[in-house]
């Protein structure tokens, strides 16, 4: 036929058998990629420190999604929570990967079978003897089956009735674990941070899908609507399918970037807004005040702060700090976190407690400014020493650490104080190993950032794809010069069957 590369899909337009074959092959590729990617990530993943080197710091992409729906154990004897396990069962990380690769192989074979045996009686209209698909009926079948799957996931898997549940954690990502979830049927179910809404929405959407599927199986579309929406043209299916996919991609881009119960920070890392709003800093401050009210010293109060919570309060874990074109995991940037040095508390010689202004998300450099509790500037690291009034040396700033590895240690040497003030701009101060991975010191984004960027980008591309194919199917007669009321089932540019010796050969 001599088709150009961008028109090769024409060969499956009027060929239901091979249309199924290429979709089977596509699903085989998707499933095979998922399984292979899981095995690769498991080969490079280090589960030894779930607090300071969690999966999202290591750039894991598919492991968080498996963990989210209840897979936490490995045949290697470890679990996501850091425990050792003796019997991981069949549904371990490796088991899920193997299942996907096995499915991929079976789909590959079935794609080949359908490509070879394309001309089945099933695909021929009994009245005309020509290839035909009952697209409204197929729509009903798919709607019904996806509704059953959706309902089953919500009613059984998430609730723990027949399944493990899903990953549940506290608002600060400290106590996460897989557990069953009760559906939330009230207004609270619409709160994106309430896990019960995930169960109730899957159950409700599943029931709706089942009912809608049965409706489309039992009720034929009116003839005028059938013709108006081009329901007999498979490109209509393509257009509406692309619409469903791009809409879903936009939605999950939002739930990932802004955060929700479906994207726990223990699995995907914190959001940029948690840094912007001082979310973890406020929780740490609340805990310190509570401990002080109990009569504990500052050192004792800070020693009670979980290292995990302190690590979230560090700008290097902000997904917006890594450039989109800086490849690699977070660990390849600032390094592998080894330990928390403690909270740096600054004072001037007059006894004012000073706080370092934190670096905003979109700054690469930021002046070192220390303010008191009223926001008045008391000290800084000046750019021009000749004009300085608030330099660390002039003001006599000292630093003392509470909690962490330097608990109780103080410094009054100006160069050391300035070093820690500069590091305090980035949140809580941690020690990093940059040698192991040859980390370059340039921040990277987390899987949260990559997922959002990828899905938002593809959603935009798919949006244009929906417009393109929708226009092609609606205005097909205008574009192709084919009368829409023509009885013969033909496609412009596809009158013969490619590779079929029984079809008449003619120039197009």
Swiss-Prot record:
Molecular function terms, GO-annotated: chlorophyll binding; electron transporter, transferring electrons within the cyclic electron transport pathway of photosynthesis activity
Kindly state which keywords UniProt assigns to this record, in alphabetical order.
Chlorophyll, Chloroplast, Chromophore, Membrane, Photosynthesis, Photosystem II, Plastid, Thylakoid, Transmembrane, Transmembrane helix
Q: Which NCBIfam families match?
A: PS_II_CP47
Q: TM spans, by residue? A: 21-36, 101-115, 140-156, 203-218, 237-252, 457-472
Predominant location of this chain? plastid
Q: How does it assemble?
A: PSII is composed of 1 copy each of membrane proteins PsbA, PsbB, PsbC, PsbD, PsbE, PsbF, PsbH, PsbI, PsbJ, PsbK, PsbL, PsbM, PsbT, PsbX, PsbY, PsbZ, Psb30/Ycf12, at least 3 peripheral proteins of the oxygen-evolving complex and a large number of cofactors. It forms dimeric complexes.
One GO cellular component term = photosystem II
Q: How is the cofactor bound?
A: Binds multiple chlorophylls. PSII binds additional chlorophylls, carotenoids and specific lipids.
Q: Does the keyword Protein biosynthesis apply?
A: no
Q: Where in or outside the cell? A: Plastid, Chloroplast thylakoid membrane
Q: Which organism is it from?
A: Psilotum nudum
Q: What is this protein called?
A: Photosystem II CP47 reaction center protein
Question: Is Thylakoid there in the keyword field?
Answer: yes
**Homology family:** Belongs to the PsbB/PsbC family. PsbB subfamily.
Q: What does this protein do?
A: One of the components of the core complex of photosystem II (PSII). It binds chlorophyll and helps catalyze the primary light-induced photochemical processes of PSII. PSII is a light-driven water:plastoquinone oxidoreductase, using light energy to abstract electrons from H(2)O, generating O(2) and a proton gradient subsequently used for ATP formation.
Its domain of life reads Eukaryota
The gene name reads: psbB
As for membrane topology, the entry says: Multi-pass membrane protein
Q: Which GO terms describe its biological process?
A: photosynthetic electron transport in photosystem II
